[in-house]
Amino acid sequence: MEHKEVVLLLLLFLKSGQGEPLDDYVNTQGPSLFSVTKKQLGAGSREECAAKCEEDKEFTCRAFQYHSKEQQCVIMAENRKSSIIIRMRDAVLFEK
């Protein structure tokens, strides 16, 4: 194998280990959380919302909801184990 091929394979291997932003979350259609510690942010996609959850410094983000019609992202410190669940038809809940 030539040096270039080895480098290319190594780069592909390293890139594949990063995964997608949503891979760390379990998503459920329908539930919404009643959360005291939360932030409402604008986001153009679920992936962008996941990135905002990961990057938040004010609290440990354990879940987020993305509302595609409004392009609204709600990041929360609680998850279904520590909060009350409310049913919402258009909500998708992502939890760690």
From Swiss-Prot:
Disulphides: 49-73, 53-61
Keywords of the record: Disulfide bond, Secreted, Signal
TM spans (from-to): none
First and last residue of the signal peptide: 1-19
Gene Ontology CC entries for this record: extracellular region
Gene3D superfamilies: Hepatocyte Growth Factor
PROSITE patterns named among the record's database cross-references: PAN
Keyword field contains Electron transport: no
Record's subcellular location: Secreted
Major subcellular site: secreted
Domain PAN: residue ranges: 20-96
Known role: May bind noncovalently to lysine binding sites present in the kringle structures of plasminogen. This may interfere with the binding of fibrin or alpha-2-antiplasmin to plasminogen and may result in the localization of activity at sites necessary for extracellular matrix destruction.
Name of the protein described by the UniProt record: Plasminogen-like protein B
Lineage: Eukaryota, Metazoa, Chordata, Craniata, Vertebrata
Gene designation per UniProt: PLGLB1
